[in-house]
């Protein structure tokens, strides 16, 4: 009987230690996830501070997919537009993530003219393939470079642009933290598109 009690006690101690190890591991994973989330939020806060209220040049020229020159002021409406900025050199998965997020939120002809895609693609054919594959309905323009510091990060980003060419709500989505992108687009939709 004493041996059975000893074996039972040992098994209980082993099970308790395994449970503690699993709980500790779960806690560590949650801590890493929380740290990552804080880092993404902190980076977007900094990006917003550095890039909000930048003013684009009113003489800026963009090109449609047929290489027709269009003045930026010609494509803006009297209401703020959501600009989706991406480049061929950006992480392809990140670009797709951003475009798919935008396409899910806005699907109205009324709003489609206020959502503009600004792409930097030396290979126009690659851009056309991307647009066709994702069945993008928004106007797409070729833009080499914009005069805001966000251009240097080499990730796709988005912002609101008003008729005075002033940027606001600059945001860089992170494919590993989709809930932040969801919140951003819900807030933008509620404020500007309803």
Give, region by region, the residue ranges found by the protein language model:
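Short, internal strand/loop/helix patches
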Residues: 128-161
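N-terminal "domain-start" segment that seeds a small globular fold
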Residues: 26-74
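Thiol-based oxidoreductase modules, predominantly thioredoxin-like and allied folds used
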Residues: 85, 112-126, 136-145
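Hydrophobic membrane-insertion alpha-helices, especially the h-region
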Residues: 1-17
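Thiol-/selenol-based redox modules, centered on thioredoxin-like
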Residues: 160-194
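Short acidic, S/G/P-rich loop/turn micro-motifs used as interaction or catalytic elements
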Residues: 88-94, 122-124, 173-176
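Short active-site neighborhood of thiol/selenol oxidoreductases, capturing the structured segment around
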Residues: 61-63, 67-105, 114
């Amino acid at each position: 009987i004493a041996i059975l009690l000893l074996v039972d006690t040992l098994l209980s101690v082993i099970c308790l230690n395994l449970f503690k190890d699993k709980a500790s591991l779960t806690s560590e994973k949650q801590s890493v996830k929380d740290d990552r989330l804080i880092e993404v939020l902190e980076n977007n806060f900094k990006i917003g501070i550095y890039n909000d209220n930048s003013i684009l040049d009113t003489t800026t020229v963009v090109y449609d997919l047929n290489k027709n020159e269009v003045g930026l002021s010609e494509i803006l409406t009297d209401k703020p537009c959501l600009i989706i900025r991406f480049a061929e050199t950006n992480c392809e998965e990140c670009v797709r993530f951003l475009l798919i997020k935008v396409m899910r939120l806005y699907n109205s002809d009324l709003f489609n003219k206020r959502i503009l895609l600004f792409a930097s693609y030396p290979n126009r054919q690659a851009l056309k393939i991307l647009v066709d594959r994702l069945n993008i309905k928004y106007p797409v323009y070729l833009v080499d470079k914009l005069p805001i510091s966000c251009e240097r990060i080499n990730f796709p980003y988005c912002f609101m642009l008003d008729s005075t060419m002033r940027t606001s709500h600059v945001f860089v989505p992170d494919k590993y933290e989709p809930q932040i992108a969801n919140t951003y687009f819900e807030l933008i939709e509620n404020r500007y598109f309803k």
